[in-house]
């Protein structure tokens, strides 16, 4: 669950994306592009990303460490990751997908 090394990897990958900044939401770090949240950390030490429903369904079926956040947030595509058990390529793919889901189209040209 909570791993400082995994947190650092997730944070570094998120902040490497174009125009991403780190802020706080309910006392936990989140990552935003042009003030739109696309990823962050949950209160219980997991990471989360914003996926579409189809992306979420596909990722949850393919990766046992990826699950919808419980309740209404999960039905909106918010997806938790036990990032301590994830490799960097999976995290990078999830973060890039989530970033693309919220970043303006003009910013996406040439990214990833």
Feature-to-residue mapping (PLM):
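Charge-dense, helix-prone N-terminal extensions
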Residues: 1-112
